[in-house]
Amino acid sequence: IPLPRRQLYGKLNHLFRIWVTGADNLLDDEDKCVLPLALPGSSRVMREVVSIMAADRILWHLLTRAVADGTITTREADALANESLRLLLPSAAQEASEESGVTQRPSPAYVLNVIHLLKTGLLFNIPFLGIDWIEKQIDSGRVARLKQALRQFGGGCQILDDIRDMARDFIEHRHNYLLSLLARDKPETLADRSHRKLSVSDRLYFHVPWSSL
């Protein structure tokens, strides 16, 4: 892959990081800085909004410059712009389905193989955007193996989030692999917790250490 296109793909990956992390910050009231901004006041929400808007404008400039330099064609730039949104939609749809809370806990296998795949696993295939649409000479079998490995790695990252966010997900009725394990194997533990006052910062996993093994 020529150096100019490799550099373009790397820059696109940073934009995806801004979009994904910025959205997570808004959804989970977190403060992971991905684009340093000097804004008046201390509003974290508006900082994330501006970061996401800025990343969108940066994408336009990157693609326009890449076309002007002959790095990619106009058609390829259009494909990258369109796919940059489409790749984020499965995760967005899964997050949207949990905003009002889930009424029942699905099986741990379903959480692991379906929900975590949509929410996080597929996001780890984003670095292949340019390869999928432009680099047709690349070994497709090798790409498929790398994608599968990265999807599994992404699922592992989501499990770590589930451990950390057990209390938040319990209170807000969101999908969580460990909570689904408890619902299946130790429903009395979940019932007991439902009668106690919890905060999202509680380290609930300390009380059920076996569930993370």
What are these regions (language model features)?
Residues V49-D162, A167-F170:
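All-alpha helical catalytic cores of prenyl diphosphate-utilizing isoprenoid enzymes
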Residues I1-A38, Q94-S107:
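Conserved N-terminal diphosphate/IPP-binding helix and adjacent helical/loop segment
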Residues P2-R5, R44-V45, N113:
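A short glycine/serine-rich beta->alpha loop
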Residues K11, I18, R44-A54:
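Helix-rich alpha-solenoid scaffolding regions
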Residues G10-R17, L80-E83, R174-L181:
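Short, mixed-charge, low-aromatic patches
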Residues T21-S43, F128-I138, R151-S211:
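Acidic, Mg2+-coordinating active-site segments of isoprenoid diphosphate-utilizing enzymes
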Residues T71-A77, F206-L213:
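Transmembrane helix-loop-helix
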